[in-house]
Amino acid sequence: YEDANKEYQTQLLNAIKIPLMVYSGRIIQNYPLGLGIRAIIKTNQLVFEAVSKSGSDVYNILSTGQLNGLSIALLLSIKNVYGDTKGLDILLIDDPLQTIDDISAISLADLLTQQGIGQIILSTHEEAKATLLRYKFKHAGMSVREQNMQALYMKTVTEE
């Protein structure tokens, strides 16, 4: 089992390491230790390190917003490598811009517009970030549909 697990991790890592470096560098642009996060295998586990600070797990270095950016970079890397556009070409992310600084939010919005994903469903409770996403997506020629879930819920509750 341990050998199979290590082989799986190695295959996954080799497949996503370049997209992860690119996407994390684009999303976490204000990171003082350099652009991009490197993934390596240590003692049978996947570890993420800053490119310029070898041996340091980024979970001990990055802020919450930067870790959110890394999570999205990992998601996009896996989708880029293993995603099948012949199937359901959709991306769903709950509050992707939460705790992310403005520069990273703009970078993420730009990156999402360049992915060619059939449908992107995002949720956020921050109006300013929703406005940013709406602007970036419309500017990229993508159609945008917004739903205020609280208003929809209140409408159904008051109608009963």
Where are these regions (language model features)?
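Catalytic Walker B motif of ABC-type/P-loop ATPase nucleotide-binding domains
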Residues: T85-D95
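Conserved ATPase-coupling elements of RecA-like P-loop NTPase cores
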Residues: G83-K86, I100-I106
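Conserved ABC ATPase signature
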Residues: L13, Q45-L76, L97-I100
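Conserved helix-loop functional segments at active or binding sites
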Residues: Q29, I78-G83
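Conserved catalytic network of the ASCE P-loop NTPase/AAA+ motor domain
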Residues: T64, V81-K86, L112-G116
